[in-house]
C-alpha cells in the first residue's frame, strides 16, 4: 500500500454530499500522512476544474497543474473535506509548499486554530 504525505495530490473516489454516488477525482492530502489505526485513513480536500464557479476560499493551482499530475487547470476547494481510505488513493503528484501553506491557513481559520 502506498504511503501519503500532506501536500500529495491523489486520485480518490470522492464522496458527494448530495447523492449516494462517488466519482474518481483528484484531491489534496491535508492530514499529516495516514491517520487512524494502521494509518488507513486520509483527510483530503477536493480539487476541481478551474472552469467551475469559484467559491470564496478556493486556491488556484496555477499554470503548473501538469507538474502536480492534473490534466487541466484546477483549483483546490478547502471547503470540501472528506475522510477516505488510503488504500483507495492513487498518487498523482505534489503541490508546491507555498500553496499547501495557504490551503492549510484557510482550513485553520475555519477551525479557529
Q: What kind of region is each of these model predictions?
A:
Residues 2, 65-113:
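C-terminal terminal-subdomain/extension
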Residues 4, 30-46, 93-98, 108-112:
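Short, charge-rich amphipathic segments
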Residues 20-24, 29-64:
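Compact nucleic-acid interaction/catalytic patches
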